[in-house]
Design a protein with these regions (language model features):
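Carbohydrate-associated surface elements
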Residues: 52, 67-79
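Nucleotide-sugar-dependent
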Residues: 107, 153-158, 165-188, 194-206
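Glycosyltransferase donor-sugar binding loop
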Residues: 123-135
């Protein structure tokens, strides 16, 4: 969409950082695919936010690189050492099964309702703003707690009190290419997590045993039961080794290396044209 107010610029280098397939989202602006084609033709370098996006677009650009979601490990890892609960979570009993993120058409509400019904003794703590869906359509039960939007700074305080995290994404066009940032954030917080089989979660996280994969409420319940009883020490050690290579600083350094290389090539080309 930025093309609509940047076409008059003549930069030395253009980079397209593509984090989602926005055209598949509910309410996507008309013409967004045409704008993307124009942008890709103009840009010398392209980054994508996950392997599935890379596979979708790699034949459409000759200098495309994949950078999955990174994580502020120190911020979320602080959840492992905190005690006490925020006021609106303090009276919620355990086990607590938590989610944080935008609550929209990408969430499978049947799975949320199913977990609640199958395990009424579990408490589902749901954090995040509602978007593009009617809040009245959210499943309601005594053990489902919709706590609304929280700030980024507050999130570790909530995650520190959760026993298991869930990512109950629907499998639809809006989730086909997502690489959820909350995956490494859950892991950095030390919260075991169960997800539906989103491609960029199954590989690498599911394949490595860092995230459990489930497709139905019944499967979610079985996986959560497993995680509630499983010791965390070995899992955490493996998770931390994986996260050590995923800081935003390291991701930015790798991006800058590509930018510097392309920038040097562009400068050389411009100087050659002046000779």
């Amino acid at each position: 969409m930025a093309l609509q107010f940047t076409r008059h610029l003549s930069p030395n280098l253009r980079v397209y950082d593509n984090m989602d397939e926005l055209s598949a989202f509910a309410g996507a602006p008309q013409g967004i695919l045409d704008l993307e084609r124009e942008l890709m033709a103009k840009c010398e370098l392209m980054f994508v936010g996950g392997q599935s996006l890379y596979e979708s677009k790699r034949k459409r650009h000759d200098n495309i690189h994949v950078f999955p979601s990174s994580v502020d490990t120190a911020h979320f890892k602080s959840a492992r050492d905190r005690s006490g609960d925020p006021d609106d979570q303090r009276e919620i009993s355990h086990p607590r099964i938590g989610f944080f993120g935008v609550i929209d058409e990408r969430m499978n509400m049947d799975i949320v309702a199913g977990i609640s019904a199958l395990r009424p003794q579990w408490q589902l703590v749901m954090i995040g703003p509602t978007a593009k869906i009617n809040p009245e359509s959210l499943p309601r039960a005594e053990n489902i707690h919709w706590l609304g939007c929280k700030s980024y700074q507050e999130l570790p305080n909530y995650l520190s009190g959760w026993d298991v995290g869930i990512m109950p994404f629907a499998l639809n066009e809006a989730t086909r290419f997502i690489s959820p940032t909350k995956t490494p954030e859950f892991l950095a917080a030390g919260v075991p997590v169960v997800s539906t089989p989103i491609t960029d979660v199954v590989n690498p996280y599911g394949a490595a045993g860092h995230v459990e994969i489930a497709s139905s409420a019944e499967e979610f319940v079985a996986k959560i039961d497993l995680l509630l009883s499983r010791p965390k020490a070995h899992w955490l050690s493996s998770v931390d080794a994986h996260l050590a290579e995923m800081s935003w600083d390291k991701t930015w350094a790798r991006m800058m290396l590509h930018i510097a290389n392309v920038g040097a090539e562009s400068k050389s080309t411009r100087e050659g044209q002046l000779v």
